[in-house]
Amino acid sequence: MKTKLIVLNYAVHALCTVFALLQFSVAADISAAAFILCAAFIAFLTIISSAVFTLKKVKNYPIVYKLYQYVPFVLLAGFIMRRAGGTALPYVQDVISVLLWLAASIVSVTMLYHLNPKRVFVQNPDFARAAAEAGLISAKNELLPKKRRGGAKFIFEALDWIDAIVQAVCTVVLINIFIFQLYVIPSESMVSEFLIGDRVIGFKTASGPKFPVSDVGLPVLRSYKRGDIVIFRNPRYPQDNKSEVKTFISQMVLMFTFTKVNLNVDESGEIKADPLVKRVAGIPGEQLVMQDGV
């Protein structure tokens, strides 16, 4: 194997290990599971990838390739689980964890680029020879499909579908957090600009989106003036860690069920009007006067 792949592999393991250590907790709640999840994933990735890159078990290459696809998602799950408990973490620890997540995600994506079946066997002849001897690839360096029958075929096809859905949902969640998100107008407050049920897209990147369940985020790159349409969290509802985790989970469930199940409800069981889509009426430094409720 080329040195580049070996270095990238070690880099991912090192970044993930430090990240996992920062999620360690002795509290008797869900936060304790964060370290266990990250550590178990890293240990499994290390064992499988070491066997593949030393050419001892080349047949496990598809597993390694799949595991690297899940690095950002597993670490994100660990980050959220650690903050779902009752113990608050220092802001500095959140910053370091986010930076480690970002670095591990970038390196893992780079690793996936080099591990792509269209490149890895062409760029690594020794790996290609070992894969051919193991019956993993053809003479044209193309992966050979495994022949499965009966129940095994059904199970693996079902797992492929589940894998595709999970990765799609996790990718959409990341896009919704940092780039843009689709919202539905719940009330008449924006008539005649928007009607009830209208869908609007809110672009987040320039507005300083926050990492889930933390105050760490991108810098705010834009300012707002009177008349701008803005999207913001409803201050009526609590925004502590427990509530933020519930909101995040409800978004995941909403996507996995194709918008059929919405768990984002208040104490009375009503769906939350959160976030809100409003028009800016006043800017910092101005005074507003209410007359006859207007």
Residue ranges of model-derived segments:
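Protein maturation boundaries and topogenic segments
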Residues: 1-275
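Mid-length scaffold segments of soluble, non-membrane domains
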Residues: 273-294
